[in-house]
Amino acid sequence: MLKTFSIGGVHPHENKLSAHQPIITAEVPAKAVILLGQHIGAPAKPVVAKGDVVKVGTRIAEPAGFVSAAIHSSVSGKVAKIDTIVDASGYAKPAIFIDVEGDECEETIDRSKTLVKECDLSAEEIVKKIADAGIVGLGGACFPTQVKLCPPPSFKAECVIINAVECEPYLTADHQLMLEHAEEIMVGVSILMKAVKVNKAFIGIENNKPDAIQLMTKVASSYAGIEVVPLKVKYPQGGEKQLIDAITKRQVASGALPISTGAVVQNVGTAFAVYEAVQKNKPLFERVITVTGKSVARPSNFLARIGTPMKQLIDACGGLPEDTGKVIGGGPMMGKALVNIDVPTAKGSSGILIMNRKEAKRGEAQTCIRCAKCVSACPMGLEPYLLGALSENGDFETMEKERIMDCIECGSCQFTCPANRPLLDYCRLGKGKVGAMIRARQAKK
């Protein structure tokens, strides 16, 4: 019997329209806009100024705190300005604007396709190279990888879990990455194991990707301690806590860190980026992004430079369809509608979903009918109908007591609601307000 997580979950239509589309190297943009806050934590601090000349891979911003990440130029050219731009979240964020000239790369970066298996570095040296390369979690959370690889002394890592689930509908970037770079991913997994000093790793893949399971299992057989675990298809299996539950049958307690279960979870794209950083001296300046939608002429998977305008990738797929109703950064369950399509891609950009007008139209919200479908669907064991009502009424103190901070914003509640209640919107609002309350309390101590 296939493994899966134990609480809640839903089954949205997969719509993997770009599955098995080879990864296309996107054109280098004429201008790149590289955000300074592409990760959880403090935005990076610029180390370049207007007029400076940069190459592909040049560090242009340094970490501004313990939880932060370095930023590197994805292009060669000249810094035009440091200013703000509205990003995919809809907020104005600081960014470095670069006018592209040529495509000159830093000499230390190995751009060859030669596989490098052996890694003689110590755990500490590996973590430093990962930090220097600006690696973050590529599954969406964008947590700085070097921080995750150095858990508090009171916790001990027992295994590495690689998230290759890609449960979000439409997105296929991770699937195609496994099909084209299985060997490099395995080396990356081995490096992660060495970094956290464990001898066991699990790669979780849902069984709607049989080709990836077969290939990754075959390649893993040559690497000590790595096991591919086929999983039952259920959303949101790619959630960190849900994946730990599915593979180890250990549940992360409310308010606890995932490392409390002994598991260090990394995305499969992150494992590939770790390989490139440690074995090829390549910083994180490009990633695979799916551009898709039912009306899109050519749904595709692109290897795109960070800072490429999303419009450029959309145009490479045939442009915006006439019946476009909404453009989503990410997937339909957890993604957010874009204010405009000129926003730049970032480290966390996994996909661009173009929805037609029929798909994009929301049903009119009705009064809650107390059916409890949202309660059954919630993978965190919360009561979304209650959280929604509390958020709507501004009762954020009670929301905190009802564990709103445990919400992973997966959208399962809203997906299953027959009354079309905007439950995810309410939960996001409440979570933001409660988070601000908690930070204010801590600041007074």
Walk through the language-model features, giving the residues of each.
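Gly-rich Lys/Arg/Thr-decorated short loops/hinges at beta-loop-alpha junctions or inter-strand turns
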Residues: 106-107, 137, 160-174, 295
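Short, well-structured beta-strand-loop connectors
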Residues: 49-62, 81
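Histidine-anchored nucleotide/phosphate-binding helix
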Residues: 179-195
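Hydrophobic alpha-helical positions that pack around
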Residues: 198-310, 316-321, 331
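Acidic low-complexity segments
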Residues: 86-143, 154, 210
